[in-house]
Amino acid sequence: MKIIGLIGGIGSGKTTVAQLFVDEGFPLVD
């Protein structure tokens, strides 16, 4: 199992990238 973290400032696209992962079936913990 791999854990991937998304970091970045406000407006850097974290939510967009997270949604792409969810759309591909990856679990998301916010």
Curated annotation (Swiss-Prot):
This is Dephospho-CoA kinase. Belongs to the CoaE family. Pathway: Cofactor biosynthesis; coenzyme A biosynthesis; CoA from (R)-pantothenate: step 5/5. It comes from the Bacteria. GO terms for molecular function: ATP binding; dephospho-CoA kinase activity. GO terms for cellular component: cytoplasm. One of its GO terms (biological process) is coenzyme A biosynthetic process. Catalyzes the phosphorylation of the 3'-hydroxyl group of dephosphocoenzyme A to form coenzyme A. ATP binds at G11, S12, G13, K14, T15, T16. It catalyses: 3'-dephospho-CoA + ATP = ADP + CoA + H(+). Residues 3-30 form the DPCK domain. The keyword Cell membrane does not apply. Keywords: ATP-binding, Coenzyme A biosynthesis, Cytoplasm, Kinase, Nucleotide-binding, Transferase. Its EC number is 2.7.1.24. It is found in: Cytoplasm. It holds the Pfam family CoaE. It comes from Corynebacterium ammoniagenes (Brevibacterium ammoniagenes).
